[in-house]
């Protein structure tokens, strides 16, 4: 992290009551209660200036729906940044289906910083002038459309918070998961030893850590190749795995 202050997420939304929501329980909730990170949900409508507290208007050029106004949202962003130090250090994100896909690599970057300001869109979108004028980075969590950016913001914050120092019980946990090395995570097993006639793979109970690591790597490669060929194509060829990398492995669980 770049500052001594706790990692802080500021969310601009028309529905601040949606926060902390699921971030108030489990790992994120305990970390929030203990001060390992901070959350501020700010109502965009508080920056409206007319008596009706209007935040949207019809699209220029016509079309369905409504558009979030640039003047209202810009005022909300500016108010949120007051007293937050240098705004250049703090990412400004807009949750949007047209944004760049959120990756684990980007999550790691965000978790190492001071924490982002996140704008949650609604309606047909927001005025492009505030996106450009306030330097908003558009981020997508998938190729689908939600009713607003709040659920996407919750997902992004959760992904970041679990990587913060002291949040997870075992520091290695965050580095041995799907996407941490570009691969999907290997299959996991625990007791009972035998479940419905299916045993835990013998190698996992062998006590040979090198063989266990090799098995997990091979399973991760097989899963990635079968389920996410887009990720598999980006995995660099490495000497210990060269044979498997030259020929796409087939995972028994994927047929």
From Swiss-Prot:
GO terms for biological process: tRNA N1-guanine methylation. HAMAP family: TrmD. It comes from Bradyrhizobium diazoefficiens (strain JCM 10833 / BCRC 13528 / IAM 13628 / NBRC 14792 / USDA 110). Homodimer. The keyword Secreted does not apply. The gene is trmD. SUPFAM superfamilies: alpha/beta knot. Disulfide bonds: none annotated. Specifically methylates guanosine-37 in various tRNAs. Residues 244-255 have a biased composition (Basic residues). S-adenosyl-L-methionine binds at residues 121, 141-146. It is found in: Cytoplasm. GO terms for cellular component: cytosol. Its EC number is 2.1.1.228. This is tRNA (guanine-N(1)-)-methyltransferase.
């Amino acid at each position: 992290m770049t500052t001594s202050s706790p990692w802080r997420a500021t969310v601009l939304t028309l529905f601040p009551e949606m926060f902390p929501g699921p971030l108030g329980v489990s790992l994120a909730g305990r970390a929030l209660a203990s001060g390992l990170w901070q959350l501020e949900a700010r109502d965009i409508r508080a920056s409206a200036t007319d008596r009706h507290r209007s935040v949207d208007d019809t699209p220029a050029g016509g079309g369905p729906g409504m558009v979030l106004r640039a003047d209202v949202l810009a005022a909300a962003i500016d108010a949120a940044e007051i007293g937050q130090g240098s705004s250049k250090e703090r990412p400004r994100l807009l949750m949007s289906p047209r944004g760049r896909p959120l990756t684990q690599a980007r999550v790691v970057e965000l978790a190492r910083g001071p924490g982002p300001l996140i704008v949650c869109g609604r309606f047909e979108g927001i005025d492009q002038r505030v996106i450009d004028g306030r330097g908003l980075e558009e981020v997508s969590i998938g190729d689908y459309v939600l009713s607003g950016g709040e659920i996407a913001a919750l997902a992004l914050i959760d992904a970041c918070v679990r990587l913060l120092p002291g949040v997870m019980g075992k520091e290695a946990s965050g580095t041995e998961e799907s996407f941490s090395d570009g691969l999907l995570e290997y299959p996991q097993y625990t007791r009972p030893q035998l479940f419905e006639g299916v045993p835990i793979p013998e190698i996992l109970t062998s006590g040979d850590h090198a063989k266990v690591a090799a098995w997990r790597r091979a399973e991760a490669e097989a899963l990635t190749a079968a389920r996410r060929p887009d990720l598999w194509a980006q995995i660099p060829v490495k000497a210990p795995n060269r044979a498997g990398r030259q020929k796409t492995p087939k995972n028994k669980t994927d047929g």
